[in-house]
């Protein structure tokens, strides 16, 4: 390859004027052998301009991601799709580690992504040498190679981070070498606090975290090595951050490597404690380790964390994520006697001076509220922000301490009440007090000492603050109303005041963060309080209008959920405003989808999805109002059209759900047109969404079968889609759905003249069976299509089987089909599939002109049917049991649980918990039933009903016994062949089936007579 030519093309991609020509040049070259290795040479060359190297790195990353994995040609095609040539792959494997070591950061990040893909596909099979290569550079005396080699090792560990234990063997073998190596390396680096040294330490910590965060490899970490690691973590957490970092702006300090290193050390110890070191909360393989961890390390680490909290109390700077992880660790320590004993003397100071301080309104909150209230709302309601927030972690620690340790709650409540009752206290501290009390609402509402005082607390301290001139106090007061919305009010006036104040804040307050909190409070009060719901009934239209305004302005997903819940609460009232509401939501959705920044902001996707869910809820609520559905249809079709036009595939599932709800009772001409549009989209990019399309396609077949059959194009579209799925690479789950749709069509159209379709359906499923089928579900589903065809017309099926020519599978197809069916009868699960199989076998045994293949399996037919009836009996028994259990659960009265740990129990907690876990594990293993759970459960596909699933449909017991009686009366010799193989037990079971069939016949006749 001509390197200069590639360099010029890459340079052209940076220039808007040359970009199209440059991209065309690259797209014509990338398949040429040696192109990918040439990109790597450009990337590592110091003689090439940096932007070109960066462009080359991005191009190589995209190539490796797309073309490194081996790909097979589509069915029926012989040309293999493009893959990077093996010679090129080998060159890249030989040089990419060096490339990562030598490259600057912005290029290195692209190369490490390449490396992850390569390791995922090639290690250990094609590339065991990567271990030796990384190890070589880790041992190099040149420290300049250490960061790159550690990044390579990180990619190796990340590849296996979430894999099951049995799949991690290649990694664990490699870590036998690497773990001692990086431990030794970090020990050497610890005394050096320079930026590069701490950067290396941080990377080693990230490797360790990825290794242990999902499973702790006990074969790699014995007590001695773990003790060394824990001392390393303790040292890093405890050491002083260089004082010169205080010169950096506070907003930028968390990104400094010294704080990041501390964060990762804390992340590790918190994870180890939570997942492996907390007796009573670990799986049995970690029982011994958890006892050792708690006894050996937990208190020592906690001592350092208490010191960090004290530094924060003394107003020293602590990075937010460090504080958060410290809270997470202490949260685990609260429940164990040994750690609680150390924590107990400090818990009041921690609660009042640290946790409380973190939970108060701060300068940065005020700044954001004033400068960008919409961003303030986004931050407060972002679950990802919550995950990393010290405020959330502090809240959790306080909640656990108050719940588990009896001395914590009364002292903290007294502290908060003192603040709330003193008019001279800083308003921000009042916010903190309300925040604390609201966070403990669930506990307070269960404690008789406190729950009777809550109503008075709301009346005296919350209602007045809803009228405060400070927006953040009004918002917090709404939040507290939300927290206590399930309170049993003794004075109806207080409840009315609460709901009125929430409504007033929603409709009249001028500050958007207050409106959002008021919306959540109002919805929660309405959902929890019947009187509140009734009281707000006259205002539903105004409330909905205001909520729509808020959603339009803030694009907040939580408010979208409020609308959704209120629609459910006021379903009758909402019907009258459903069209206006949906029209508003559709306008907001269109605005969001067509905004310039849509693709860049994930929140917009979440919010747009929330709108679609809300419209879906409206459709469900008004399903009994066809005149409203008709008006909503046009609005929804515009939304569907917009999503399909813009190919926003992340919303395909939601718009298909809308279309499904629009076709549940009738199907308009416009909805039939949508079928054709969906078919075109399906051909382009909806291939993997077939399972999401299935409920809608099922409606097209079952809701208006006359319209389906009135236009041959409709059936052709459905068959073509099924064929594409069954002949493509959609995966066996989707293929099961395609086969199910074919079965539904056959059963729905029995006796309605689709004879010309049956051979096409049969050929398709039998050809699929000749290719490799991994799951029994797909195999039985394909067989079921043929069984449905047998029920539709035995003559047509066997004529088709005689005519079918299957590729790579010579020989009579009829006998292959019958034999496969007989071999697989025990794989038919759920009610419908077993019923279909019984009906099919009944048709088979009753045939007068039987193919020889049926005679050959005579001995298997009745035993198979009896086995299927036994399965049906189990399904029915399980359903009855589940119904009884659900009924009994519903009748249980909630009992207040006292979850505090008494001092006498403390020392025994971990031992008894483990003993109980061990006993539970044993009893579960010993209580194995002969029947797998999956045999008892309905299959997912059974939700797609057929005429056989209706209450007044063919009864399988009567169908079978009638068929067998017919044979007995008409063909005694054949009857003897069928019953001769039966054992005495099977004959008894056959008689039970006869008895049950007669009982069902009598019941049906009685119902008919009534």
From Swiss-Prot:
It comes from the Eukaryota. Residues 22-102 form the Importin N-terminal domain. GO terms for cellular component: cytoplasm; nucleus; plasma membrane. GO terms for molecular function: ATPase-coupled transmembrane transporter activity; small GTPase binding. GO terms for biological process: intracellular protein transport; nucleocytoplasmic transport. It holds the Pfam family Cse1. Residues 886-895 have a biased composition (Basic and acidic residues). The keyword Cytoplasm applies. The keyword Protein transport applies. It is found in: Cytoplasm; Nucleus. The modification Phosphoserine is found at residues 902-903. Disruption phenotype: Knockout animals present with reduced grip strength and diminished vertical activity. Progressive dilatation can be observed in the aortic root at the level of the sinuses of Valsalva and distal ascending aorta, and aneurysms of the distal ascending aorta are becoming visible at the age of 8-12 weeks. Generally, males are more severely affected, exhibiting larger aortas and experiencing dissection and/or rupture more frequently than females. Residues 886-932 are annotated as: Disordered. Its main location: cytoplasm. Residues 910-921 have a biased composition (Polar residues). Keywords: Cytoplasm, Nucleus, Phosphoprotein, Protein transport, Transport. Residues 896-909 have a biased composition (Acidic residues). PANTHER family: IMPORTIN-7, 8, 11 (PTHR10997), IMPORTIN-8 (PTHR10997:SF26). Involved in nuclear protein import, either by acting as autonomous nuclear transport receptor or as an adapter-like protein in association with the importin-beta subunit KPNB1. Acting autonomously, may serve as receptor for nuclear localization signals (NLS) and promote translocation of import substrates through the nuclear pore complex (NPC) by an energy requiring, Ran-dependent mechanism. At the nucleoplasmic side of the NPC, Ran binds to importin, the importin/substrate complex dissociates and importin is re-exported from the nucleus to the cytoplasm where GTP hydrolysis releases Ran. Belongs to the importin beta family. Forms a heterodimer with KPNB1. Interacts with SRP19. Interacts with RPL23A. Binds directly to nuclear pore complexes. Interacts with LRPPRC; the interaction occurs when LRPPRC is in its RNA-free form and promotes import of LRPPRC to the nucleus to allow for EIF4E-mediated export of mRNAS from the nucleus to the cytoplasm. This is Importin-8. It comes from Mus musculus (Mouse).
């Amino acid at each position: 390859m001509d390197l200069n030519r590639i360099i010029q093309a890459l340079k052209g991609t940076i220039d808007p004027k040359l970009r199209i020509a440059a991209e065309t040049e690259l797209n014509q070259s990338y398949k040429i052998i040696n192109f990918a290795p040439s990109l790597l040479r450009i990337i590592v060359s110091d003689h090439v301009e940096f932007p070109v190297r960066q462009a080359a790195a991005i191009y190589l990353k995209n190539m490796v991601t797309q073309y490194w994995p081996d790909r097979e040609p589509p069915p029926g095609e012989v040309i293999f799709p493009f893959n990077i040539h093996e010679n090129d792959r080998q060159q890249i494997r030989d040089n990419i580690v060096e490339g990562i070591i030598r490259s600057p950061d912005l290029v290195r990040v692209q190369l490490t992504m390449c490396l992850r893909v390569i390791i995922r596909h090639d290690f250990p099979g094609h590339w065991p040498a990567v271990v030796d290569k990384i190890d070589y550079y880790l041992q190099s005396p040149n420290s300049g190679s250490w960061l790159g080699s550690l990044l390579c090792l990180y990619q190796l560990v990340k590849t296996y981070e979430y894999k099951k234990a049995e799949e991690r063997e290649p990694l664990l073998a490699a870590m036998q070498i690497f773990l001692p190596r990086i431990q030794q390396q970090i020990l050497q680096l610890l005394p050096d606090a320079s930026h590069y040294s701490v950067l290396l330490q941080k990377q080693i910590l990230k490797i360790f975290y990825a290794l242990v965060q999902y499973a702790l490899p006990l074969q790699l970490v014995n007590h001695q090595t773990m003790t060394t690691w824990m001392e390393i973590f303790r040292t890093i957490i405890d050491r002083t951050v260089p004082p010169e970092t205080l010169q950096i702006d506070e907003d930028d300090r968390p990104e400094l490597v010294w704080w990041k290193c501390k964060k990762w050390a804390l992340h590790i110890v918190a994870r180890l404690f939570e997942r492996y070191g907390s007796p009573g909360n670990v799986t049995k393989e970690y029982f011994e380790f958890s006892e050792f961890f708690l006894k050996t390390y937990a208190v020592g680490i906690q001592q350092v964390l208490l010191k960090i909290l004290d530094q924060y109390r003394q107003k020293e700077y602590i990075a937010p994520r460090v504080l958060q992880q410290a809270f997470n660790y202490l949260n685990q320590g609260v429940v164990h006697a040994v750690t609680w004993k150390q924590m107990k003397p400090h818990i009041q100071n921690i609660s009042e001076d640290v946790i409380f301080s973190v939970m108060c309104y701060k300068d940065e909150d005020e700044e954001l509220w004033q400068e960008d209230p919409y961003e303030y709302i986004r931050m407060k309601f972002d679950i990802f922000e919550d995950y990393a927030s010290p405020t959330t972690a502090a809240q959790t620690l306080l909640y656990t301490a108050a719940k588990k340790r009896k001395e914590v709650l009364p002292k903290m409540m007294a502290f908060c009440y003192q603040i709330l009752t003193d008019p001279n206290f800083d308003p921000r501290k009042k916010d903190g007090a309300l925040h604390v009390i609201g966070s403990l609402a669930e506990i307070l509402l269960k404690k008789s000492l406190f729950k009777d005082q809550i109503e008075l607390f709301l009346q005296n301290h919350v209602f007045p603050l809803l009228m405060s001139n400070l927006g953040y106090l009004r918002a917090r007061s709404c939040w507290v109303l939300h927290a206590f919305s399930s309170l049993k009010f003794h004075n109806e006036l207080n409840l009315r005041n609460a709901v009125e104040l929430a409504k007033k804040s929603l409709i009249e307050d001028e500050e958007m963060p207050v409106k959002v909190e008021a919306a959540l409070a109002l919805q929660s009060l309405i959902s929890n309080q019947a009187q509140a719901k009734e009281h707000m009934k006259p205002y539903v239209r105004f409330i909905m209008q205001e909520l729509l305004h808020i959603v339009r302005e803030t694009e907040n997903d939580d408010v979208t959920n409020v609308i959704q819940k209120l629609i459910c609460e006021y379903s009758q009232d909402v019907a009258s405003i459903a069209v206006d509401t949906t029209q508003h939501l559709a306008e907001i959705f269109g605005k969001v989808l067509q905004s310039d920044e849509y693709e860049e902001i994930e929140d917009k996707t979440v919010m747009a999805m929330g709108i679609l869910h809300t419209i879906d809820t409206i459709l469900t609520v008004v399903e009994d109002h066809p005149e409203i559905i008709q008006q909503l249809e046009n609005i929804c079709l515009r939304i569907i059209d917009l999503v399909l036009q813009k190919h926003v595939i992340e919303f395909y599932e939601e718009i298909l759900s809308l279309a499904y709800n629009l076709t549940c009772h009738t199907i308009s001409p416009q909805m039939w047109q949508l079928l054709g549009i969906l078919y075109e989209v399906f051909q382009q990019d909806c291939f993997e969404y077939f399972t999401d399309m299935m409920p809608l396609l099922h409606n097209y077949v079952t809701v208006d079968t006359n319209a389906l059959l009135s236009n041959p194009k409709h059936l052709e579209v459905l068959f073509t889609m099924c064929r594409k799925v069954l002949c493509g690479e959609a995966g066996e789950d989707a293929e099961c759905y395609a086969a199910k749709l074919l079965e539904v069509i056959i059963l729905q159209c029995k006796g309605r003249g689709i004879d010309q379709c049956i051979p096409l359906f049969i050929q398709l499923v039998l050809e699929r069976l000749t290719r490799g089928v991994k799951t029994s579900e797909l195999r039985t589903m394909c067989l079921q299509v043929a069984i449905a065809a047998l029920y539709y017309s035995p003559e047509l099926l066997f004529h088709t089987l005689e005519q079918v020519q299957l590729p790579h599978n010579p020989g009579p197809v009829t006998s292959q089909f019958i034999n496969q069916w007989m071999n697989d009868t025990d794989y038919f699960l759920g009610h419908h599939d077993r019923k279909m199989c019984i009906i099919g076998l009944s048709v088979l045994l009753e045939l007068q002109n039987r193919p020889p293949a049926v005679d050959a399996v005579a001995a298997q037919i009745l035993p198979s049917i009896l086995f299927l009836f036994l399965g049906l009996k189990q399904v029915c028994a399980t359903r009855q049991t589940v119904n009884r259990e659900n009924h009994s659960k519903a009748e249980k009265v909630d009992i207040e649980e006292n979850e505090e740990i008494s001092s006498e129990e403390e020392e025994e907690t971990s031992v008894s918990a483990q003993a109980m876990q061990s006993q539970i594990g044993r009893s579960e293993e010993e209580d194995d039933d002969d029947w797998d759970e999956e045999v008892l459960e309905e299959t997912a596909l059974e939700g797609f009903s057929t005429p056989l699933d209706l209450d007044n449909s063919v009864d399988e017991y009567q169908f079978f016994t009638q068929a067998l009686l017919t044979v007995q009366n008409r063909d005694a010799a054949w009857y003897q062949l069928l019953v001769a193989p039966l054992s005495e037990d099977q004959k008894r079971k056959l008689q039970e089936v006869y008895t049950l069939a007669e009982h069902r016949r009598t019941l049906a006749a009685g119902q008919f007579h009534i």
